[in-house]
Amino acid sequence: MLGMIRWVVEGTLVAMLLSAIRRETGMIFFYNQYQLGGWIHRYLSWGEMCYTRTLKMVKRSKFFRKQLNEDGFGRINDSGPKRRGRDQSQYSSRFVELD
């Protein structure tokens, strides 16, 4: 039983990671090429829901605060590493056009 709980928790964490990648970069997992596309879509939707709920919980928590420049994690308004190639601003945070 504990092994199954572990797999569910790890699967949820991977789905949440994919959700965070989608929200930060606009890149999505190309699941339409697989026969299990419907199942994969539901799995990714589960990750989206868990990620959204986690963010809401963190924002309400007294244990978290906004990042300051003195924290040493880079600039606050930095959008991450420099992107090469195409400008990513053309993509919305919800839907991405794939080449």
Curated annotation (Swiss-Prot):
GO terms for cellular component: cytoplasm. It is found in: Cytoplasm. Its main location: cytoplasm. InterPro entries: Mitofissin. The keyword Chaperone does not apply. Residues 1-19 form the signal peptide. It holds the Pfam family Mitofissin. Disulfide bonds: none annotated. PANTHER family: CHROMOSOME 16, WHOLE GENOME SHOTGUN SEQUENCE, DUF1748-DOMAIN-CONTAINING PROTEIN. This is Uncharacterized protein YKL018C-A. It comes from Saccharomyces cerevisiae (strain ATCC 204508 / S288c).
